């Protein structure tokens, strides 16, 4: 169910997280179609996800990749890890991520791992709570990464220097 595939396209890493067969029941029977969940990132703090649906698997994956490229957000990273611990939630899924020392690697499962890898996070400790639905985990992970603030952002917001807030 949760297949992963990585493709390089114009400096973007693309990962296929899940393909699912769905059906619509009509008067004459069932109409089968497929959904695909993908994430795209540049490995340097830009990441996006897409969800596509079509009658054939390749078409669903293509739609999902296009949506992911259009839906990219920028994340402030700190030398391949996070600036501080963050929490994110979407629907019934909750995620917790914290920075890790160099050499730790990406300690995350399934859909969360795919998002972190394409975003360019190399060292992180993470845990998913509640629902492990891949779509909700991806949304919760991107929500958590988007809520992360770099010291420069905090300093600018407070009108201070980075040195002043780090004391």
Curated annotation (Swiss-Prot):
Family indicated by similarity: Belongs to the universal ribosomal protein uS5 family.
GO molecular function: rRNA binding; structural constituent of ribosome
Protein name stated in the entry: Small ribosomal subunit protein uS5
PANTHER family recorded: MITOCHONDRIAL RIBOSOMAL PROTEIN S5
Pfam families assigned: Ribosomal_S5, Ribosomal_S5_C
Record keywords: Ribonucleoprotein, Ribosomal protein, RNA-binding, rRNA-binding
Function summary: With S4 and S12 plays an important role in translational accuracy. Located at the back of the 30S subunit body where it stabilizes the conformation of the head with respect to the body.
Protein source organism: Vibrio campbellii (strain ATCC BAA-1116)
Subunit record text: Part of the 30S ribosomal subunit. Contacts proteins S4 and S8.
Biological process annotations from GO: translation
Sequence ranges assigned to domain S5 DRBM in this UniProt record: 12-75
Domain remark in the UniProt entry: The N-terminal domain interacts with the head of the 30S subunit; the C-terminal domain interacts with the body and contacts protein S4. The interaction surface between S4 and S5 is involved in control of translational fidelity.
GO cellular component, one term: small ribosomal subunit
């Amino acid at each position: 169910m949760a297949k992963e595939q990585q493709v390089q396209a114009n400096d973007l890493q693309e990962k296929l997280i899940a393909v699912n067969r769905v059906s619509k029941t009509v008067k004459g029977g069932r109409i089968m179609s497929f959904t695909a969940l993908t994430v795209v990132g540049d490995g340097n703090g830009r990441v996006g996800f897409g969800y596509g649906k079509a009658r054939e698997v390749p078409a669903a994956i293509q739609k999902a990749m296009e949506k992911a490229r259009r839906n990219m957000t920028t994340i402030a990273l700190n030398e391949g890890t996070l600036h501080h611990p963050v929490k994110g939630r979407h629907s019934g899924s909750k995620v917790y991520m914290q920075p890790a020392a160099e050499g730790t690697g990406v300690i995350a499962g399934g859909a969360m791992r795919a998002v972190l890898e394409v975003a360019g996070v190399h060292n992180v400790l993470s845990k998913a709570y509640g629902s492990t639905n891949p779509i909700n985990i991806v949304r919760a992970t991107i929500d958590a990464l988007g809520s992360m603030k770099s010291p420069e952002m905090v300093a600018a917001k407070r009108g201070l220097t980075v040195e002043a807030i780090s004391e």
